[in-house]
């Protein structure tokens, strides 16, 4: 376990203790559920102030079953970093970054009346298709906003999608992660 602690220490030193965990993967794999559980078990218990704790709980993303895309844009959770102390007295200021993810076959929410749903984003002066915005936001989480990337995948056993539905989107995420070095 010694090497595990030195990894935390190395990250804490290089980032001045600020850790942004980018949670990426295809849509409808459980990214927001992962963030919700991480918040409940690691982040929220480390918040001392009851008002800050309540606000952090309110900032936790929603999660739901089904084929409907729930996340619509990248989101930093919690809004303010929370200090977590590891077993070896290494302190890290942690925030998670949620994203829409790359589109999977049979997901719903990116089309409206059989045409691409158009959205305005901070990255464009004009409306772009939701699917394109989701890809841009996911790439930004991977390349611009994360100290550590966590990829969430699914085998189709707990969703209304098949394993095959996820494969192309997973390959896109893997390609993006590998490109970061």
Write out the residue ranges for each language-model feature.
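Conserved G1/Walker A P-loop phosphate-binding module
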Residues: 1-127, 143-145
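Conserved C-terminal guanine-recognition region of P-loop GTPase G domains, centered on the G4
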Residues: 83, 87-89, 113-181
């Amino acid at each position: 376990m010694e090497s595990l602690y030195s990894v935390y220490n190395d990250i804490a030193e290089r980032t001045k203790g600020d850790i942004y965990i980018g949670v990426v993967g295809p849509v409808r794999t459980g990214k927001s559920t992962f963030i919700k559980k991480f918040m409940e078990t690691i982040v929220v218990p480390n918040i001392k102030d009851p008002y800050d704790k309540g606000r952090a709980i309110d900032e936790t993303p929603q999660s739901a079953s089904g084929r409907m895309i729930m996340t619509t844009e990248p989101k930093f959770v919690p809004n303010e970093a929370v200090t977590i102390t590891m077993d070896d007295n290494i302190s890290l200021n942690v925030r998670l970054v949620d994203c829409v993810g790359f589109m999977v076959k049979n997901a719903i929410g990116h089309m409206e009346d059989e045409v691409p749903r158009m959205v305005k984003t901070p990255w464009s002066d004009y409306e772009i298709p939701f699917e394109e915005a989701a890809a841009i936001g996911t790439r930004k989480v991977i390349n611009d906003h994360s100290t550590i990337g966590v990829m969430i995948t699914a085998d189709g056993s707990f969703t209304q999608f098949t394993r095959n539905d996820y494969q192309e989107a997973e390959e896109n995420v893997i390609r993006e992660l590998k490109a970061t070095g």
